[in-house]
Amino acid sequence: MRALIIGRWQPFHNGHLSIIKEISNEVDEIIIGIGSAQKSHSLDNPFTAGERIMMIIKSLKKYNFPYYVIPIKDIEFNAVWVSYVEALTPPFDIVYSGNALVKELFEEKGYEVRKPKLYNRTEYSGTEIRKRIINNEDWKHLIPNGVINVIDEIDGENRIKRLNMKDYDIIE
C-alpha cells in the first residue's frame, strides 16, 4: 500500500519526522508532497522546493523505507486539485492529512484519509521555528540534523531574518 502526505515543510521538523516514521510502519511506500512548491523567499515560505527536498532526503537517509518526494504547486482550483495531484505522483491508496479541506477533497474522490498524530504542536511548528530563528532563540533541537545542514548550507537563518525586515539592513 502506498500513502500520500502533503505539507509545506517550512522547515521539515522533528514533528514531521515522527509522522513520516509512524506512517512508514503502516504502509509499504510514502509519497511526500512538497505543497506550495512555487513559493519561497517569504516569511511564511522561506525555502525553495529544492531546498525542502534536500531537507527531507537528508533527514530520512538513515531510515530504511521507500519514499518519493514530489513538488506540488498550488493551482487555486479545488474542484480539480485531486486530479492534479494524481497526475504528478505515483498512484496511492491512502492519504494522511490533518487539513479539513484536503480531507474533504480526497474523500470526495473515494480516498481513505487518515489524520496523523501530531507531536508537540507548540514547539514542532514551522511558524514557531521561524519565529525562534528571528528572535535568536534555541531552535536546532526541533529539527533533524539533515535540516540543520541544509539551513547552514544556504544561510537560511539569515534569509529568514532578512525576510522579517521592513527595510534592508546588514545582518551582523
Curated annotation (Swiss-Prot):
Superkingdom, natural source: Archaea
GO molecular function, one term: ATP binding
Keywords linked to the UniProt accession: ATP-binding, Cytoplasm, NAD, Nucleotide-binding, Nucleotidyltransferase, Pyridine nucleotide biosynthesis, Transferase
Pathway the protein acts in: Cofactor biosynthesis; NAD(+) biosynthesis; NAD(+) from nicotinamide D-ribonucleotide: step 1/1
Keyword Nucleotidyltransferase: yes
Reaction it catalyzes: beta-nicotinamide D-ribonucleotide + ATP + H(+) = diphosphate + NAD(+)
Gene Ontology cellular-component annotations: cytoplasm
Compartments where located: Cytoplasm
InterPro entries referenced in this protein's UniProt entry, alphabetically: Cyt_trans-like (IPR004821), NMN_Atrans_arc (IPR006418), Rossmann-like_a/b/a_fold (IPR014729)
GO BP, sorted A to Z: NAD biosynthetic process
EC code: 2.7.7.1
Keyword Oxidoreductase: no
Annotated family: Belongs to the archaeal NMN adenylyltransferase family.
PANTHER family noted in UniProt: BIFUNCTIONAL NMN ADENYLYLTRANSFERASE_NUDIX HYDROLASE, PHOSPHOPANTETHEINE ADENYLYLTRANSFERASE
Name of the protein: Nicotinamide-nucleotide adenylyltransferase
Organism: Methanococcus aeolicus (strain ATCC BAA-1280 / DSM 17508 / OCM 812 / Nankai-3)
